[in-house]
Amino acid sequence: MDIRKRKNAGGDGDGGADGASVNVGDEPDSFGGRIGSPRRIFLFCLAFRVVNALLIQTYFNPDEHWQSLEVAHRTIFGYGYMTWEWKRGIRSYLHPMLFAFLYKLLQVTGLDTPYIMIKAPRLMQSIFSAIGDLYLYKLSDALYGGNVATWSLFCQMANWFIFFCLNRTFSNCLETVLTIMGLYYWPCIRDSSIDYPVNRKWGLVIAALACAIRPTSAVIWLYVGMLELFLTPNKVKFIILEVIPIGSLVLGFTCLLDRLMYGSWVIVPLNFLKFNFLSSGGDYYGTHPWHWYFTQGFLVMLFTFTPFSIAGIIKSKNQKLSALILWVLAIYSILGHKEFRFVLPVLPIALIFSGYAFAQMEVSGSSSSSSVTKKKQVPRQNHTKWSPKLRLSVYFLLATNIPMALYMSLFHQRGTEDAMNYLSDEAYKGRVKSILFLMPCHSTPYYSTLHRNIPMQFLDCTPSAEKGELDESDQFLVNPLGFASELARNWSEPPSHIVLFASEETKLRDFMIQHSFKEVRRFFHAHFKVDRDLQSSVVVYVVNHAFP
């Protein structure tokens, strides 16, 4: 087996990125030498992510639907619910517009059927995910060589959380793809003596787009930008001729887009940062202790890759990327409101270190070498025999991550999506007149899945200016029967369908009978509780006289 031969622009380093190693050309183990050309790698990743997208049938977080698809649906079809964030101007239209183009294509081709409307957005996201996979391979190859790149790609595809989350339509997912792409082009991350300014400009463009889509991405690019500023010999040129013009162009473009869509001038990044960082507005949706990312959140995402990532960080001695992970986790730890997806952009970086550890094990087992990037050439072995340690490690990761990925993607919290898919099909057949969701706000997808302009009502949870004031969701959970009875007093005509969790349904059965509702479908939702009491199933009720 070849161990990649490289030229070191900064002396005889130990193979980490801080050693500034570069390619000497397309040798057998150079980029793509292990598993094919960039095109073949991309097509392989795309096929994998398409299957990945089709396997995701669960609900994770409301923003997947309410902050992207719902907005895009309203833009193209003229109806859809805009949450309070859009009324306060803390969201940019840049990300939803990607899906608006998809919806427009489906509209003009007449393909906007219930099934395609449900599946198409995640299939579109699978293209972005595959691009991210390709650039993870390219970045790993630029840093450490083709062997590490192959293992890094394996780790990316085997990680349960990447499988579960990356193909969802969160802005965080596109931010993650742009982060990996951008890091590939920045000279301070990898030595790039050829076409140096062009690479950096591309890196700046991608970084600016990431910040436009997700303003908190500035946490990542502030670190990278300061590192580049420290290392570049021409600091004035970097700031005056590159950062300011490129940043201004991207900011200007997004401001014009938001001006067109909002109808007035809105500086979204400023509003977003003010709400989330200065006023801690996100705390309304719950808080975690400062150490949560370090002791729970990021470790759950890495799962059984954790020891391998730690080993890779130690062995590679790549202080730049390991410090980036630490920086992001530390900054996000300052905020009270924490979520797994907020730190998703640095998960692939941690998986690169896992790939390094696996490549180290492979090389150590096959040639007794102590370094993945050792300059020595070893004759190619067509069939490299894995050491027992390497084989056991691979089996261990697959045995732990595959069941987790499939369970979370196919079973855990699937009831709300199943219920909406059912209602979408019923509405398509003209069997739904109106829907009331008696469950915590944003528990289901909305018009982007139903795709029929019929009256729907859910329980509002807009943050209140009065501290301690209960929103509709909280009021309902405190007293389900009293809240539902108050709603019913104002009905001129009852909704044709009511959707609720089984935990509340048991308290409202008499109410349902009294108002002539009967159960029509029940969907499994979860085996264990997450934030609230166990929501084991989602129940759909229909009023008896809704249809003759």
From Swiss-Prot:
Cellular localization per UniProt: Endoplasmic reticulum membrane
Name of the protein this chain belongs to: Mannosyltransferase APTG1
Topology versus the membrane: Multi-pass membrane protein
Origin species: Arabidopsis thaliana (Mouse-ear cress)
Top-tier EC class: transferase
Gene Ontology molecular function: any one: mannosyltransferase activity
Taxonomy of the source species: Eukaryota, Viridiplantae, Streptophyta, Embryophyta, Tracheophyta
Primary role: Mannosyltransferase involved in glycosylphosphatidylinositol-anchor biosynthesis. Required for the pollen tube micropylar guidance and embryo development by regulating GPI-anchor mediated protein localization (e.g. COBL10 and A36).
UniProt keyword Transcription present: no
The family this protein is said to belong to: Belongs to the glycosyltransferase 22 family.
Disrupted-gene phenotype: Embryo lethality at the globular or earlier stages. Compromised pollen tubes micropylar guidance, but normal pollen germination and tube growth, associated with an abnormal localization of GPI-anchored proteins (e.g. COBL10). Impaired apical plasma membrane localization of COBL10 in pollen tubes, important for the growth of pollen tubes in the transmitting tract of pistil. Lost A36 plasma membrane and cytoplasmic punctate localization which displays a constitutive reticular localization.
Annotated keywords: Endoplasmic reticulum, Glycoprotein, Glycosyltransferase, Membrane, Transferase, Transmembrane, Transmembrane helix
Residue numbers spanned by region Disordered: 1-23
